[in-house]
Design a protein with these regions (language model features):
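C-terminal lobe/tail of nucleotide-utilizing enzymes
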Residues: 1-23, 181-259
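Phosphate-binding loop that captures ATP/GTP phosphates
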Residues: 3-15, 50, 55-100
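Walker A (P-loop) phosphate-binding motif
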Residues: 6-58
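Signal for well-folded cores of large energy- and translation-related assemblies
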Residues: 16, 41-44, 79, 89, ...
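Structural motif
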Residues: 25-30, 53-58, 99-103, 135-138, ...
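Short, flexible loop segments at the rims of nucleotide/cofactor-binding pockets, characterized by
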Residues: 29, 74-75, 108-112, 132-135
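Hydrophobic alpha-helical segments and helix pairs
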Residues: 89-126
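Conserved catalytic-core segment of NTP-binding enzymes
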Residues: 114-220
Length: 259
C-alpha cells in the first residue's frame, strides 16, 4: 500500500524551491484563449520567465492560439519516453509551453513512481522560472485537475455571451468549499458591451449568493500573478506539491490550503 504521507514528505523535499507564483487559468471560448495567449506573451516579453502547463488538447490550446505545433505531452517526458526539451514548445522570448493534457489525467490517482518522476520534472522546470501558468481544463463534471487545483490563484476568463458565462458558473459553483476564497474573473472581448457587462454582473451575484465566493474583476493577468506572489512565502512553497498530491489522492477539487 502506498503511504501518501511519506510520499508527500519525500516529494516535498525534492521540490523545496517550488516556483514562487502558480496561477491556474480556466478559459471559456476562443476569445478567452486568445486573451490568455496575449497576456502570457506580454508578461514574458516584459521579462517574466513563464512556464505553461497546457492541459487543453490540440484544439483550444495555447500552441494552437500561437499557430505552433506540439508533438509530445509532458507525461511522455515524465515517463522518460522522450526528453523534456522535446516536449517544450517555445512561444516567444521567456515563454515555454508544455502540453499536459495526458499528464493532468495521469495525476489523478498517480502511483508513487509517477508522482516522484513528476516532482523531479517539476524541479527541472522551475529553474529560472518566475511564473507557472496552468491552462486548466475541467472534466465533464467541472472538476479541476490536481495541478490546476493546487495553484495559488485561479483566473476564470469568459466571453461576453451566455454560453461562456454559464460554463464558467458550472465550474465556479463546484469550488464553494475549495482552496480559493476569491477567484479572479476576466472578460475577453466585448468589454464595452452592456449585455456582456450585465452577464458578468449577474454571474458575480449568483456566485456570491449560492457559494459565498467573491469574484474579483481583472483586466490583466499581472494582477493575478501579483496576488499569487503575496502567498508565496517559504512555507507555502513547501506545501505546493503536497497540495498537488492531496488532490491526486482524493480526486477532489475541494481540498483547502492548509495554514
Amino acid at each position: 500500500m502506498i503511504r501518501f504521507g511519506d510520499q508527500a514528505n519525500g516529494l516535498r523535499r525534492l521540490l523545496r524551491q517550488a516556483p514562487p507564483q502558480v496561477v491556474s487559468v480556466a478559459t471559456f471560448g476562443p476569445d478567452a484563449v486568445r486573451w490568455l495567449a496575449r497576456e502570457a506573451r506580454t508578461g514574458a516579453a516584459a521579462g517574466r520567465q513563464t512556464v505553461v502547463f497546457d492541459e487543453v488538447g490540440a484544439c483550444g490550446s495555447l500552441a494552437d492560439a500561437y499557430a505552433l505545433s506540439a508533438r509530445f505531452d509532458l507525461l511522455q517526458a515524465v515517463d522518460r519516453h522522450v526528453g523534456l526539451e522535446s516536449v517544450c514548445v517555445e512561444a516567444g522570448q521567456g515563454l515555454n509551453l508544455f502540453p499536459a493534457a495526458r499528464m493532468a489525467k495521469a495525476l489523478v490517482g498517480a502511483d508513487r513512481i509517477l508522482a516522484a518522476r513528476f516532482a523531479q520534472t517539476c524541479q527541472r522546470l522551475q529553474a529560472g522560472a518566475d511564473l507557472w501558468l496552468v491552462h486548466a481544463r475541467s472534466s465533464e463534471d467541472f472538476v479541476l485537475s490536481p495541478l490546476a487545483a493546487a495553484a495559488h490563484r485561479l483566473v476564470v476568463v469568459v466571453e461576453g455571451n451566455a454560453r461562456s458565462v454559464t460554463s464558467a458558473y458550472s465550474l465556479i459553483k463546484q469550488l464553494a468549499e475549495g482552496p480559493w476564497p476569491q477567484i479572479d474573473l476576466a472578460l475577453a472581448g466585448g468589454r464595452d458591451s452592456r449585455d456582456a457587462e450585465a452577464l458578468i454582473a449577474n454571474l458575480g451575484a449568483m456566485v456570491l449568493a449560492h457559494s459565498g465566493l467573491a469574484l474579483r474583476r481583472i483586466n490583466r493577468l499581472e494582477a493575478s500573478a501579483a496576488a499569487a506572489a503575496m502567498v508565496s512565502d517559504e512555507q507555502e512553497r513547501e506545501r505546493f506539491l503536497e497540495r498537488v498530491l492531496g488532490f491526486a489522492r482524493r480526486g477532489s477539487r475541494t481540498l483547502a490550503f492548509e495554514v
